[in-house]
Amino acid sequence: MKHETNIEALHQAKKRLELEYNKKQLAIEISITAGSRVVEELWERKIMQYSLSSSNRRKFMMYAVRASYDNEPITYNQLKKLLNISDIALTTMWRECSDAGWIVTTKAKRANQTLLASDNLLKSYNNYMAHVRQAYKNSGLRTLAQAIVEMEHLIAHEDYENR
């Protein structure tokens, strides 16, 4: 009976920790998607506004950044498949970002054209990630995540000990 009570108490505590974690994570995600980060530079603010204006634009820019981080340009066709969008939509995003100087493209025919993020897009994303890291640090999510892991270990140990 005591074993069942201990296990139940551990499960309840774990559920409360998970709920608190979920609430804090949700607050961070809402803050990010609401564009709550204050950006001083106009060029960076324009990148932020563009990337937050639609999920496809955000993903387009993230794929450009990843291509640059990996030093592996991404093709038009790869992006079309990844984003699952029409030629018109992709061509429009590509042109808008190229005209704004946020991507560097090759001059090949459209299907084989490749892109990488520009230095400003990379700098903007790096600044954004510094903001996200600080938000996570301030939220205490890491501590909550570790507490959940420890709770799982206690539950597993309690189950094992009382078999």
At which residue positions do the language-model features occur?
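A short, conserved structural fragment
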Residues: 98-108
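Short, locally clustered residues in the helix-turn-helix/winged-helix DNA-binding domain
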Residues: 61-69
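Short amphipathic alpha-helical interaction segments
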Residues: 84-99
